[in-house]
Amino acid sequence: MFGPILIFDSGIGGLSIFDEIRKVLPDQDCCYLFDNARLPYGELEESVLIKGCVELICEQALKIDASLVVVACNSASTLVLPGLRERLSIPIVGVVPAIKPAAKLSIARHIGLLATPGTIKRSYTRELIEQFADGCKVELFGSSELVMLAEAKLAGESVDLIKLRAQLEPIRQSKLDTLVLGCTHFPIIASEMQQILGNGVKLLDSGVAIAQRVVFLLNEFSLDKVVDNRTKNLTAIYTTAEISAGLTTRLAEKGFTKIVSRSSANLG
């Protein structure tokens, strides 16, 4: 087994990536670090986002001697990867919206990207569309409200379908046939989204591709960090003083045995 993987997100959206990684690496140690004190990232100034993310990720990666870092956040991935690669010598995996497979899959040649406002406005996103969706009509939809709906669901609350329907109405009206979920929070409410959009709209995310990339990189670059540890270690660290009982329960159900605030974590 390899040394621990550090998975980072602004909130619980990265758990959609964690779930896919666990399917292919069920015995792998993981540390899930979520910066819920600054949620949602899609509305932060770029300089603030970059500085905070790089500091948090580097601090924790060094503490746990991580084999690999997954930035399981689209908003952060568009900005922080260069800074991380300057400071860390381990592989860094970011999340890229699934524009390329969506363009190949769309029969109508009409796709949508649903992401946070920050991801929607970045030049990186426009470059992806220009490179991989040539010949397709691409519509962009930004929403921070869906991030909070996903957070609420994982904390044990029912999804507010009225709010969700209002957020998705422009997509329903667009008549597209393929929708890219460009935020790792969104797969958490994918079943509710499918219910509203109907089966005529295919939903795509990057979770499986990220998990496959992680496996490849661990085998390719991390052989020097193989450890002998028969006890799985799944740790979740948050940046607020506390989290809800509902979220604590959901994290425990996913196998996390240590769930602590960054201020009280003793992982060094």
From Swiss-Prot:
What UniProt keywords apply to this chain's record, in alphabetical order?
Cell shape, Cell wall biogenesis/degradation, Isomerase, Peptidoglycan synthesis
Q: Where is the active site?
A: C73, C183
Please provide the Gene Ontology terms (biological process) for this protein: cell wall organization; peptidoglycan biosynthetic process; regulation of cell shape
Pathway note? Cell wall biogenesis; peptidoglycan biosynthesis
Q: Output the Gene Ontology terms for molecular function.
A: glutamate racemase activity
Q: Give the enzyme class.
A: isomerase
Enzyme Commission code(s) on record: 5.1.1.3
Record field: catalytic activity: L-glutamate = D-glutamate
Entry-linked InterPro entries: Asp/Glu/hydantoin_racemase, Asp/Glu_race, Asp/Glu_racemase_AS_1, Asp/Glu_racemase_AS_2, Glu_race
* Pfam annotation, one family: Asp_Glu_race
Q: Which residues bind substrate?
A: D9, S10, Y41, G42, N74, S75, T184, H185
| Functional summary from the UniProt entry | Provides the (R)-glutamate required for cell wall biosynthesis.
> Entry's NCBIfam families?
glut_race
Family indicated by similarity: Belongs to the aspartate/glutamate racemases family.
Query: Which HAMAP family does the protein's record reference?
Result: Glu_racemase
Name of the protein:
Glutamate racemase
The organism named in the record is Shewanella pealeana (strain ATCC 700345 / ANG-SQ1)
